[in-house]
From Swiss-Prot:
Repeat region (2-alpha), residues: 478-516
Family indicated by similarity: Belongs to the ribosome-inactivating protein family. Type 2 RIP subfamily.
1-alpha repeats (start-end): 348-388
Modification comment: The precursor is processed in two chains, A and B, that are linked by a disulfide bond. Glycosylated.
Reaction equations catalysed: Endohydrolysis of the N-glycosidic bond at one specific adenosine on the 28S rRNA
Protein known as: Ribosome-inactivating protein PMRIPt
Keyword Ribonucleoprotein applies: no
Its EC number(s): 3.2.2.22
Leading EC class: hydrolase
Tissue expression profile of the protein: Expressed in rhizome and more abundantly in leaves (at protein level).
Length: 603
């Protein structure tokens, strides 16, 4: 007979119930036992610290479990379930078994709606945070002696209890092993400070790595280094700010307007703790490689004859599907729509500029070095217009070669020519004519035209106030880095990453080109636009073979050919990168790893 329908409590003072020596866990408020008949079968995954080479597969499996309900129709970045909507208990948590080098195992219970650690167990004792919920209490680690910790699971509380900030805590295989097999396994005989510090290690190496491919890569490298027992790293400013700002970046992505333009700004820091303002999705993705988003808001359903005013959902993210109703979340969580003002940069990093800072009707729009002047400020309105100084950007007609100017929005000679659509790949298109903004040449004072879309670099644009090229190395198949000779008409290939090697550094321009950092007149180029054509380095010319788009699925796409960069035959020894049809295979996966000061990843 069940003694209690829910949970059987035997509440005693921790110091008495466990016979704990003075100075260890003396501030635990209570100990209780749970009814084992309430045990739920949750999805479970395993990771053995001795098998560090499987770390990438472990993180991939974790992402797959927590995104099983994500819509499969649209973009590539899944949004986690909304905790405000009903989620079957059996699908609410995932159990992660972490086994140390001595065979001891710690089990984490992660909430699938946010990847937070809800509770954990070790050595047949379950530990809950101070702010545990009834859902957690009634369904996790039933039948175990259970201890309630005096702190919560957020970073502020954990760092306060640990007495040390994350920036001063080493991460890597040895810290993870010690966290699991010493501090967490021996939780009843160590201080709460030790438990909190251990959790800071575990959370970053599991939950944060699942949220961000950037963090996953840093951790993975620590596992696969030749001397991994000694190899550790500490979080830098970029990593810490990514962890802190995950909710705000999730909100900005979900409410971003077409082209992934943010309504607000995500305030990050670079690795040296200098401010880094991010106002568009492409920049955010290149810095963080965000892989999962917290649910913040949904997009309104488009009614007959209309389209969503926030189409970024279809271009970037996969919204969760209500596991009970089989529909996407909307209702009261609908995203608010804004009208951000940003700069628009393009060919050779030059900005769109209203000539002579004049707001007279008919003044052409030209390329000009980027600055803070008002005639380079463009506001993206919900009616589809893009305006500067109160005037609409419009073409002089619907014919290829017509120039682009500003004009009074209500009296423009070709009314529908004032409407524009910004694509996530950087094209700005007039939907009536299908023509796109184009810079005929890379020179200041060049007047912009509308022409047929060829997906050339002359037609690539980036909307955002950070107009400087992003310098990065590019990690590909087998976690090796893209490298070139930095000379014209030479091939690129993969080598072991050595971040102090200039041949592995690339500058990402707003026109969609990937340039040699040491000579920015040289561009990564496809030697043709057919499958199996080689990827080489050529002098930049703004052509169709030099525009490359980093997709959220990890591929690098040539939008004209609709082919992606591919390590030929998955064989790095061939030293060939080619264009090929998308297959989803690992030899077509790439990631940017950006650092402004270019230290080693393990520093």
């Amino acid at each position: 007979m069940r003694v209690v329908a829910g949970i059987l409590y035997i509440v005693v003072m921790a110091i008495c119930g466990l016979g704990i020596q003075g100075g260890t866990l003396q501030d635990y408020p209570s100990v209780y036992f749970q009814d084992s008949t309430l045990q739920q079968d949750f999805p479970t995954i395993f990771f053995n610290i001795l098998a560090g080479e499987t770390y990438g597969d472990f993180i991939a499996d974790l992402r797959e479990i927590v995104t099983r309900t994500a819509d499969t129709k649209n973009g590539s970045i899944p949004v986690l379930l909304n905790p405000a909507h009903p989620v079957p208990v059996r699908e609410r948590f995932v159990k992660v078994h972490l086994t140390g080098r001595n065979g001891k195992t710690v089990i984490l219970a992660l909430d699938v709606t946010n990847l937070y650690v809800a509770a954990f167990s070790a050595n047949n004792v379950a530990y809950f945070f101070r702010d545990f919920s009834a859902l957690e209490r009634e369904n996790l680690f039933s039948g175990m002696l259970t201890i309630r910790l005096s702190f919560t699971s957020n970073y502020v509380s954990l760092e306060h209890k640990a007495g040390v900030g994350r920036e001063n805590i080493s991460l890597g295989p040895t810290p993870l092993d010690e966290a699991c097999t010493k501090s967490l396994w021996s939780g009843t005989t160590v201080t709460e400070a030790s438990i909190a510090k251990a959790l800071l290690v575990v959370i970053q190496m599991v939950s944060e790595a699942a949220r961000f491919r950037h963090i996953e890569e840093r951790v993975r490298r620590s596992f696969t280094a030749a001397d991994h027992d000694q190899l550790t790293f500490r979080p830098d400013g970029l990593m810490l700010s990514m962890e802190n700002e995950w909710p705000s970046m999730s909100l900005e992505v979900q409410r971003s307007i077409e082209g992934g333009i943010f309504i607000g700004v995500v305030q990050l820091q670079d690795e040296s703790f200098q401010p880094l303002r991010v106002d568009n999705f492409n920049t955010l993705s290149r810095y963080t490689m965000v892989a999962l988003l917290l649910f913040r808001c949904g997009h309104p359903r488009a009614t007959a004859g209309t389209s969503s005013t926030t189409p970024a959902a279809a271009q970037i993210i996969r919204m969760p599907v209500d596991v009970l109703a089989g529909e996407e979340y909307y209702d009261e969580e609908t995203c608010t729509v804004g009208e951000p003002t940003r700069r628009i940069s393009g060919l050779d990093g030059l900005c769109m500029d209203v000539r002579n800072e004049s707001n007279n009707d008919g003044i052409p729009i030209q390329l000009w070095p980027c600055g803070a002047q008002r005639n380079q400020q463009w506001t993206f309105h919900t009616d589809g217009t893009i305006q500067s100084m109160g005037k609409c950007m419009t073409s002089n007609g619907y014919h290829p070669g017509d120039y682009v100017m500003i004009f009074n929005c209500s009296t423009a000679p070709v009314p529908d020519a004032t409407k524009w659509v910004v694509s996530i790949d950087g094209s700005i298109t007039n939907p009536h004519s299908g023509l796109v903004l184009t810079a005929p040449q890379a020179a200041q004072t060049t007047i912009l035209l509308v022409v047929r879309n060829t997906h050339s670099a002359k037609q690539g644009r980036s909307v955002g106030d950070d107009v400087e090229p992003i310098v990065t190395y590019i990690v590909g198949f087998k976690y090796m880095c893209l490298q070139g000779n930095n000379e014209n008409n030479t091939r690129v290939w993969l080598e072991d990453c050595a971040v102090d090697r200039p041949q592995q550094w690339w500058a990402l321009y707003s026109d969609g080109t990937i340039r040699v950092d040491s000579d920015r007149s040289l561009c990564v180029t496809s030697d043709g636009h057919s499958s199996r054509d080689a990827i080489i380095i050529l002098t930049c010319d703004g052509g169709i073979n030099q525009r490359l788009v980093f997709n959220t699925d990890g591929t690098i796409l040539n939008p004209n050919a609709q082919l992606v960069m591919d390590v030929r035959q998955s064989n790095v020894a061939l030293r060939q990168i080619i264009l090929y049809q998308p297959t989803g295979n690992p030899n077509q996966q790439w990631m940017t790893m950006i650092t402004r000061t270019r230290p080693s990843l393990t520093s």
